[in-house]
Regions:
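Non-catalytic interaction-recognition regions
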Residues: 1-93, 110-588
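Flexible, low-complexity linker/hinge segments
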Residues: 100-110
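Short, charged, solvent-exposed linker or helix-capping segments at domain edges/interfaces
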Residues: 94-99
């Protein structure tokens, strides 16, 4: 199904051609002055230079070809040469009906589907998720959903940090606290216990304690470094402990991510890439890419066009230990081997930009990826408190993610109970659904690359550009449709008729932009464009709702038309919020 703007552009292009001009000037855009017209074409302005002719004259020639237009009810030339356009209500209604019949609401499936791996989430095991983990998880999840909706094969990978010093610190602290455990007995030859010698809450206390000690006690730090080394060498007792740490930690991470409605296809870890490192490093040395610099092994990645210094990409430290760059490069090797992706996208803090410039350049220079494989980095900004500084607890500490979710849920519960629109037994569940919309929409409505203020009062409001406002609109539509069914109406009967007033036509025009918006949101990896769109659709619907008697309309065909339009609006809004990663309750 052709997008509405494509159909308009085709007609404009044909008019340019008939008038003797290049059809490529027939591009149509949404009007930047909706008080004057619905759409506009600026092609005559662009063509004036090529044809040595006043733009007003070119526009006049083109408009003359639109006198019997199937699409436009008005085509008017405005000096110095703009073409202002209004669309026929019949054409818009016809498009609405086709859109309603289309399973994907007029979004075309990608003609050349790609395999795309999105690396997002990225927590370290044995540490609780905190608010700093929020953005990667929900931005990555949304981009994954949008990519799948437009027809690509998108694989989400959490890429756990499980192989660094934190493991050595936990093992060392456990050894100090419980030296009698069999994991520390070098003479032990039996099977290690199936049950972990700690709970998740104990594990989350052990790590910060060990980390604090290592900063003050050099001998303790050296012991932890040695434990890390022995683990990486495959010491049986330490490997068994590592498995326990992983199992306990991943179970808790899955629970926390489920509360955010974030779901990963792969739970790959840094350790999964370790087997690829020796051959990868050896190959880079053999082919002359890697060389020693002050004892470390590095690859030059600077380019002549650089405007700032890009240091060499370090593969191995002087003691032979690998780094994040090594692991990330080996992970690329693993991903190319297992999935042959067309693109790998990393959704991480923008402060890691230099790291990824080095990794991507090294991967390209050394041939770890195919020349056509796209490596991309979406660096997001910081989530700040009202003071403009990184979001903290009232005491100034880093807030755990589950505490933030609980605080938002509590605030939504209070507002819902005040509203008394939901039975008390359902209020808690409804508060969770609406609370998640407040968090996700509050974040995703901002351009990912920018910092933003996390304002609990604003994000949980039922008014303005918020998640709860969008859900309130969906619930309002559901309520009208349910009432019609309860009165004996059949929602499968009827079709959308030409708009009877300006607010209805505006709603239809907003809905007609769905396909172009989704495709653009994926192309630019920009979930904020979905938020901006559904806010406009919600406003358009609420204006229509306040100006139109829907259920009391006496003309049955007209009433059925309104209800078909409501069903389409609900589908567009529900599909959009699903792409953002949340859903709507039945009542609020």
């Amino acid at each position: 199904m052709k997008k509405i703007m494509e159909q308009m552009a085709e007609e404009l292009s044909a008019a340019f051609e008939k008038a003797g001009y290049d059809p490529s000037y027939g591009k149509v855009t949404v009007s930047n002055r909706p008080d004057l017209c619905e759409y506009q074409c600026n092609g005559a302005m662009a063509g004036a230079k090529a044809y040595h002719k006043a733009p007003f004259m070119i526009a006049d020639d083109v408009v003359a070809q639109l006198s019997d237009s199937r699409i436009f009810s008005r085509a008017e030339v405005v000096k110095p040469g703009f073409i202002n356009l209004d669309v026929k209500p019949e054409f818009v209604a016809e498009y609405m009906n086709k859109m309603a019949e289309d399973e994907k609401l007029s979004v075309e499936t990608a003609k050349n589907p790609k395999t795309i791996i999105i690396d997002y989430g990225g927590p370290n095991v044995a540490k609780p998720l905190h608010v700093g983990h929020l953005r990667s998880a929900i931005i990555g999840e949304s981009i994954k959903r949008i990519g799948r909706f437009v027809g690509h094969k998108v694989i989400g990978d959490v890429h756990l940090g499980d192989w660094g010093l934190q493991m050595g610190l936990i093992i060392t602290e456990l050894k100090h606290r419980k030296p009698e455990l069999v994991y520390f007995d070098d003479s032990f030859t039996g099977e290690y216990p199936a049950e972990a010698p700690f709970t998740i809450s104990e594990l989350e206390e052990i790590y910060p304690c060990a980390s604090g000690k290592s900063k003050e006690d050099e001998a303790y730090r050296n012991e932890a470094l040695e434990a890390t080394h022995l683990l990486q060498q495959g010491k049986p007792g330490y490997m068994a402990l590592w498995n326990h740490i992983m199992n306990v930690s991943v179970t808790d991470l899955k629970r926390n991510y489920a509360n955010l409605n974030v779901d990963f296809d792969l739970w790959k870890k840094e350790s999964d890439a370790q087997p690829y490192i020796p051959d990868m490093v050896e190959d880079m040395k053999k082919r002359g890419f890697a060389y020693e610099d002050q004892g470390a092994l590095v690859v030059d990645v600077k380019e002549e066009s650089d405007t700032k210094e890009i240091p060499p990409c370090m593969l191995l430290k002087s003691d032979g230990a690998s780094l994040y760059t090594t692991t990330d490069l080996a992970t690329i090797v693993e991903r190319m081997k297992l999935f042959q992706p067309d693109e790998i996208l990393y959704v991480v803090d923008k402060r890691q930009e230099l790291h990824f410039i080095q990794v991507f350049r090294c991967a390209r220079k050394t041939g770890l990826v195919n020349p056509e494989t796209k490596l991309s980095f979406l660096g997001f900004g910081t989530m700040n408190g009202k003071d403009g500084k990184p979001f903290k607890t009232r005491e100034g500490g880093v807030m755990r993610l589950e505490n933030l979710i609980a605080d938002i849920d509590e605030e939504m519960y209070r507002k819902i109970v005040e509203n008394r629109s939901v039975k008390d037994k359902d209020a808690k569940d409804t508060a969770k659904i609406v609370g998640l919309s407040a968090i996700k929409y509050g974040d995703l409505s901002n351009q990912a690359t920018k910092d933003y203020i996390f304002d609990v009062d604003r994000f949980t409001s039922f008014e303005g550009n918020t998640g709860p406002y969008i859900l309130y609109t969906i619930v309002r539509i559901k309520s009208i449709l349910n009432r019609y069914v309860q009165e004996g109406g059949d929602l499968s009967i009827g079709k959308i008729l030409p708009a009877v007033n300006a607010s209805e036509k505006n709603l239809m025009l907003q809905l007609s932009g769905f396909a172009a918006m989704v495709e653009n949101a994926f192309e630019e990896k920009a979930p904020h464009k979905i938020c901006a769109y559904i806010y406009e659709v919600s406003n358009a619907f609420n204006s229509f709702y306040h100006e139109t008697k829907i259920l009391s309309e006496e003309d049955q065909a007209q009433k059925e038309s309104f209800l078909q339009l409501l069903q389409l609006t609900r589908r567009v809004l529900e599909t959009s919020i699903d792409l953002l990663g949340f859903s709507a309750p039945d009542r609020m």
